[in-house]
Amino acid sequence: NAGTVEFLLDDATGEAYFLEMNTRLQVEHPVTEAITGLDLVELQLKVADGEPLPITQDDVTVTGHAIEARVYAEDSFGGFLPQAGRTSIVRWPGSSAPHAPRASREADDPVRVDHALESEQIVSTSYDPMLGKVIAHGATREDARRALVAALDETSILGLTTNVGFLRALAASDEFRDATIDTAWLDTAEVEKPDDELPRIFVAWVSAMLTAVTDSGHPFQSDGWRSGADPAPTIVELDRPVVVDRARGTVDGIPVRQIDAAHHTLTLAVDGTRHRAVVNVQPHVAEVAFRGQRFAFERPDVFGDHALDLGDGAITAPMPGTVLDVRVADGDRVDAGQVLVVLEAMKMELSLKSPFDGTIGSLNAATGAQVALGATLLEVQPDE
């Protein structure tokens, strides 16, 4: 069998230590291909077919640096829990239109993308959560790092949460830039999630345009309204009310100017600084991909009946998966912090605990059942 052998190199001594051998390519093989210019897939197939390697070790030269970022269906800012769902919009570096061909690397392009994820595709927890790989190459490590940050800025996945925003924040951090991290760094690092203020402005701006669109207009026109009177400010209900005044060019009093918009990609100058995001506004939820991070704002149905408020006693599934164990029954008395249900997904177990002292009611969870993200498993009725 053909395979790849993995070693760990001690930079201080120059000694190499054997790690493992796999009868396949390593996930990181694009990094090797980027710095050597070799096609490892072609070489491995030739060896598997009985041909000798056409090169020797002396023929291999290393040029520049390369960094690979693995894109996973996980909530990195929420305990790295696996995620599942249907993608709504997927944009990889180099593709901006809804149905653009899969991103690929040109000869002079420092960024390569390997993936099989498209828009309107279902992502399940039944398989490995890796969705793709973004690889950046540069003459120096810093060149490669900057190219990677820019590429992750262009990566937008809506419909489910991924780790792209986390990867972008990590690659942009001072510690990663200065190469002062180690294998234990993430245990104590404070990689900050992007603030939701700018994404909220993007959603509010688009929502106001969609609300005010006329038969002769287009929601993404950038030259203002053509009617005789200025439009009145629009109140957009998101996680909080947001006032959009398109005539004055403000969102909650912050100056906003639309620069460009096409295929859900919107460029705004917010308080004088240019920003770009991918926005998808639907009747009940509005999503934004900004600096790789997905933000979702629920849009309340102000005309419909209010749903039953389950309060903090509703225990919901924080991830899609399988119910491993139900440790309570209807009517049981429970204490704050007591484990009620255990879920499993992607080889991870998560214990769901009671938020307070109370009594179990409306038990919907059953051992072995598959549950969706956000499904209500049971309710804890608080003590009087």
Task: Indicate residue ranges for each PLM-predicted region.
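Conserved metal-phosphate-binding beta-hairpin within the catalytic cores
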Residues: 1-26
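Catalytic P-loop NTP-binding/switch module of NTPases
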Residues: 274, 280-318
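Short, hydrophobic/aromatic-rich segments at coil-to-beta transitions
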Residues: 230-236, 261-267, 285
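Conserved nucleotide-binding/hydrolysis modules and their immediate coupling elements
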Residues: 245-275
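SH3/SH3-like beta-barrel fold
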Residues: 268, 288-289, 352
